[in-house]
UniProtKB/Swiss-Prot annotation:
The modification S-(dipyrrolylmethanemethyl)cysteine is found at residue 235. InterPro entries: HemC (IPR000860), Porphobilin_deaminase_cofac_BS (IPR022419), Porphobilin_deaminase_N (IPR022417), Porphobilinogen_deaminase_C (IPR022418), Porphobilinogen_deaminase_C_sf (IPR036803). This is Porphobilinogen deaminase. Its EC number is 2.5.1.61. Monomer. The gene is hemC. Tetrapolymerization of the monopyrrole PBG into the hydroxymethylbilane pre-uroporphyrinogen in several discrete steps. GO terms for biological process: protoporphyrinogen IX biosynthetic process. Pathway: Porphyrin-containing compound metabolism; protoporphyrin-IX biosynthesis; coproporphyrinogen-III from 5-aminolevulinate: step 2/4. HAMAP family: Porphobil_deam. It is an enzyme of class 2 (transferase).
Length: 303
């Protein structure tokens, strides 16, 4: 079968798409790749949360599927909204990479070594919230652009450190580009480290790609995405959520709050694996009972 894949044209997006292409070819399919820029790739002078709207890195890819020029799209799952246009669905969640965030620096080994007032680059309100809760003295600055341009800004001294997803660092072998790479103790974004395959809702396409699903990753990310969906939080909201499947139990921890780290709700819980389809909503409802929606509304007003 010939399968057409829509992809962003960044280095990381193409790595991800080529990875899926190779798996499809190994199953006997032929593959075409259609690359494009998304709104999130084009508008680089504005923090993502200020651009507003959901699907900043997915909408153009979705349009190409709805128009019939592509069958599937490969995404970083953390960028994928929790709702889909009619005719499209999240068809697969692939085996997950490292879910952690990481700090890269040319001078400092880890977050605690950073001097007072150090300039730290990240786009993510979730990362900003958690870092400032730990180190309120740091200067967190919005850092947009592709991975290579971010590392270039670190190397030329614009930043003392930058924060990226460890999965992307591993996939592109970026540790060799900088002196220090260290995982940081933040709760990741929903779906972080996993690739999500969005597809047109056609049986022959869905059947052809079903083998890409990884059960453990599906269980974990279903909880994470249901949690964020119940809170009505977009991909840019300051929400961290991580589910870990261990045997027949799932350990879940989550955090949300104000972007400056001054007010935070955090909790953890263990659910039976069999409850994974309701656990995310139930966990979110507990946060809502503690005022999570009001807190997120205030966080949105701070941006």
């Amino acid at each position: 079968m010939n399968i057409k894949i829509a992809s962003r044209n960044s280095a990381l997006a193409l790595w991800q798409t080529h990875h899926i292409r190779d798996l499809l070819i190994a199953q006997g399919h032929s593959v075409e790749i259609i690359t494009m820029k998304t709104k999130g790739d084009v508008i680089l002078d504005t923090p993502l949360a200020k651009i507003g709207g959901k699907g900043l890195f997915t909408k153009e890819l979705e349009n190409s599927m709805l128009e019939g020029s592509a069958d599937i799209a490969v995404h970083s799952l953390k960028d994928v909204p929790t709702t889909f246009p009619d005719g499209l669905k999240l068809a697969c969640v692939c085996s997950r990479e490292d879910v952690r965030d990481a700090m890269l620096s040319m001078k400092y080994k880890n977050l605690d070594e950073l001097p007072q007032g150090a300039k730290v680059g990240t786009t993510s309100l979730r990362r900003k919230m958690q870092i400032l809760a730990h180190r309120a003295d740091l200067d967190i600055i919005s850092l947009r652009g592709n991975v290579n341009s971010r590392i270039a800004k670190l190397k030329n001294g614009e930043f003392d450190a930058i924060i990226l997803a460890m999965a992307g660092i591993n996939r592109l072998n970026l540790s060799k580009e900088v002196k220090f790479t260290s995982a940081i103790d933040t709760i990741p974004a929903m779906g972080q480290g996993a690739l999500g395959i969005e597809a047109i809702d056609k049986k022959e396409i869905l059947d052809a790609i079903e083998f890409l699903n990884d059960e453990k990753s599906v269980v974990e990310t279903t909880i994470e995405r249901d949690f964020v969906h119940t809170l009505n939080g977009g991909c840019q909201a300051p929400i961290g959520i991580n589910a870990k499947l261990k045997g027949d139990k799932i350990e879940v921890e989550a955090i949300l709050g104000l972007v400056d780290g001054s007010e935070i709700l955090r909790d953890s819980k263990t659910y039976p694996k069999l409850a994974y389809k309701i656990a995310g909503k139930n966990f979110a409802d507990e946060f809502i009972a503690r005022g999570a929606k009001e807190l997120l509304k205030r966080a949105e007003e701070m941006v």
